[in-house]
Amino acid sequence: MTKRGKKPDWRTEGVRIVKASDVDFNTPQTCGMTRAAAINLAKAGAQKLWAGTVSVQPDAKTGAHQHGHLESIIYVVKGRARMRWGERLEYVAEADPGDFIFVPPWVPHQEINARTDEPLECVLVRSDQEPVVVNLDIEPVERPEQVWIDPNHPQG
């Protein structure tokens, strides 16, 4: 039974599959990356989550940005993600395929494709439906401080 007291029609209210060819590129963008929505209210009926893909071309980087009150999880599928964050993007760490990245609310950050020979491909999950993307004008530090994402993965 649902909250409304009637039995759900699992055929129409159950599992949803969004094909890769059906993702929506009409999302707020940041220079240097391509975002596409896969799971949201419009595509799948999701009420509390947003999920999609992010792509950064070889040897490219995004502009600095943050996502307001939203938490973000990034899963690296292909390539090497170099993340910079902080008031002046003064911290840096890298993630490889299979690694997860957590970006807390309000954190200024930048995604960089650390590879010159292949695109960086990631899956992105956010804690809400709101398309919050605040692009920032930040003067980055010259040499960011390196920080480990996971002590099992050496920096490269």
Residue ranges and their predicted role:
Residues 57-59, 85, 95-115, 125-127:
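Conserved metal-binding segment of the jelly-roll/cupin
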Residues 53-54, 73, 102, 117-134:
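A short hydrophobic beta-strand segment most commonly corresponding to one strand
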Residues 61, 70-97:
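A short beta-strand-loop-beta hairpin characteristic of the jelly-roll/cupin
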Residues 43-47, 57-61, 78-82, 131:
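Short, charged/polar surface micro-motifs in flexible loops or helix N-caps
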Residues 35, 52-68, 105:
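Conserved short histidine dyad/triad with adjacent acidic residue
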Residues 43-44, 69, 88, 116-117:
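Short strand-connecting beta-turns/loops that link adjacent beta-strands
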Residues 1-48, 63, 133-156:
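A short, N-terminal "cap"/entry segment at the start of jelly-roll beta-barrel domains
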Residues 47-49, 67, 95, 114-116:
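Short glycine/proline-enriched turns and hinge-like loops at secondary-structure junctions
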